[in-house]
């Protein structure tokens, strides 16, 4: 189960490879992806206590230590919000998931059909790096 979830999360991180959904901040690399929660199987969503429906997106962030051999995952503090085009804010609450050497931060975000959200996230990995991650993405609901 854990290997399957790790594979799924790595796949989701790799999906937008052409878009390079990552940001370098000092000695850390922040990788991110956002997707409709229906991409998760019911079993995986349940095991991580994630809501699985067509009106919830999952934000997945991993932070890697660029200064260490092999760029291992590193812990970070993440805070932030998502804002839609009319300025409504949705605070993000991140759950840390550790699987072997991997560390993921997951947040759930309610979405509406064809809604454009701008994410503003503060990433703090201590002396390794701290800064802001900002990106926008359009979401589509599933019935």
Task: Name the predicted role of every residue range.
Residues 4-13:
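Sec-dependent N-terminal signal peptides
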Residues 13-19:
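Sec/Tat signal peptide C-region and signal peptidase I cleavage site
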Residues 59-102:
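Mid-chain, structured segments of secreted extracytoplasmic proteins
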């Amino acid at each position: 189960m854990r290997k399957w979830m790790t594979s799924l999360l790595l796949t989701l991180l790799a999906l937008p490879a052409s878009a390079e959904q990552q940001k370098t901040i000092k000695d850390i690399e922040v990788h991110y992806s956002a997707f409709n929660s229906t991409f998760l199987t019911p079993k995986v969503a349940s095991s991580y206590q994630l809501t699985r429906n067509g009106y919830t997106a999952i934000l997945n962030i991993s932070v890697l230590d660029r200064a260490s051999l092999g760029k291992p995952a590193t812990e970070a503090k993440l805070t932030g919000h998502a804002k839609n085009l009319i300025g409504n804010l949705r605070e993000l609450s991140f759950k840390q998931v550790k699987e072997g050497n991997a560390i993921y931060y997951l947040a759930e975000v309610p979405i509406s059909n064809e809604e454009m959200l701008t994410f503003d996230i503060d990433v703090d990995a201590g002396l390794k790096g701290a800064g802001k991650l900002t990106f926008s993405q359009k979401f589509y609901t599933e019935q």
